[in-house]
Amino acid sequence: MVESSKQNLDALKDEYKSVQRGYLPKLDAGASYSINEHEYPNNPKKRANAYGSINYMLYDGGKKYDIYDGYETNIKSGEKSLDALKNNLSLTVIQYYFDYLSLEAKKDAKQKEIEQLTAQEDRIGRFYNAGTTTEDELQKIVSRLQNAIVELQEIELNIITITHNLEYITGTQVSIKDGSKLEDINNLIQKNPRFDIQALDFVTQSKQSVAQAQKSGYYPTVTLDNTFNYYDSNYDNSTFKDPNNHQNIASANMKWNLFSFGQTKYQYESKQKEYLASRSNFEYEKNKADVDLQLALKSYNIAKAKIKSTEATLKAAQSAYEIIKSKFENGLIDNVAFLQSLTEKYDAISQHKKAINDLEVKKATIIYHSGEKLQEYIRW
């Protein structure tokens, strides 16, 4: 995707160079040879002709500079679109990366839960074989263990899916390791709109230049021409011979369209309306982007609060689990309370780690909406 956008941008730059070269003087050359059936004073039996001409558009009604402005803003738009694409991909990769870490934390918690359930299955199984507990007590543990195993498989599938998605985006095999974070954004100041909004602004400016270029139809065009011809005439009748064998013609030409049934007017109005439509769309998208940034800032503050909340939940769940586990193993409570406490403990562990990872995604979202390059904020 990025390489394709680069190629399109390079193609636009080459096209602009071609247009610029088109306004430079043009030099042409040509030659001809003819044999006529009948000979006349101005029509020899045989004639060879060679010519060279130079042509220059001195003035085109001001259209040239509007065309130049249009190409330059289109190129700037292409550059910002490329930055927007890179930033979009960076944000997507960051989201996948921290989702992957959250799933790995969830997987680790689930594996530890399975270890605890397996140990309790063995313990209750021994009591059941000894006749000191009922079968339903054992089956509750077995059922919870099987559910945990299925949940682990689902987590592993989600991890594989993220890995494949990252490989699709990057085009290479990926190996994900923990440790990457984003720089602190407390001092981040929005200097520019989002890259796609900047690109849209340049597109709008380009349409304005195209509209202005239509006004050139109201003004004359002036060209300068110089043509040199060389003749080699071969007459059978020597009285027809002309002593002159060359001719040079220099001319200055002006063309001014005085009336065209409103063609120029309607061309301008058409392009002007396209510009106004683009300007309206730009203002809408710009306002929407401002709202997106404000929402991202609020989400970031909520994410910070969620970390504190999940941390408190985790401490409570761990404390409750240790107490309930001790009571359960001493036969003071049934396994329903124990299983509930076990699930809450490991859910709290994974939720806390997920909250930490989600905060990094929220930071990335703010950087993205602030018109900054995400790659410059990643700490490996």
How would you label these PLM feature ranges?
Residues Q351-W380:
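Acidic, low-complexity, intrinsically disordered peripheral segments
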Residues Q267-S309:
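C-terminal structural cap/anchor segments
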Residues D136, L332-K354:
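Short terminal targeting/anchoring segments
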Residues K86-Q198, V203-Q205, A211, A296-S299, ...:
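Periplasmic alpha-helical coiled-coil/stalk elements that build and connect Gram-negative outer-membrane
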Residues A296-D334:
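C-terminal hydrophobic structural anchor segments
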Residues M1-D28, T132-D136, E167-Q212, Y219, ...:
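Bacterial Sec-pathway N-terminal export signals of envelope proteins
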Residues K26-L85, F202-K207, G217-E285:
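Small/polar-residue-enriched beta-strand and adjacent coil segments characteristic
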Residues Y128-T132, F328-L332, H369:
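A short glycine-centered flexible hinge/capping loop motif at secondary-structure junctions
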